[in-house]
């Protein structure tokens, strides 16, 4: 997964755990595609300050995922749903039942 996509996904899950400032910077840089210079100019700080805070925010998001694993679990469930859909499309009921059982085991 590309870094931008990964950070966006982590932000979807863990963004509320960041400070408001961290959320603003991640949103501006990754979701609104502003450059470091644009953000720095708008905030009246150095480009380096913005860069460092974004990197710390990224590290915090990665740390939350490492500890909680919600994104990995979400992706695993999406894969199981894909397997279930494929099995149903093939009319492979035994494979569909296995995928469904795996999903139910999580509930």
Curated annotation (Swiss-Prot):
It comes from the Bacteria. InterPro entries: RNA_pol_sigma_r3/r4-like, UPF0122, UPF0122_fam_protein, WH-like_DNA-bd_sf. Belongs to the UPF0122 family. Might take part in the signal recognition particle (SRP) pathway. This is inferred from the conservation of its genetic proximity to ftsY/ffh. May be a regulatory protein. NCBIfam families: YlxM. HAMAP family: UPF0122. This is UPF0122 protein STH1464. The lineage of its organism: Bacteria, Bacillati, Bacillota, Clostridia, Eubacteriales.
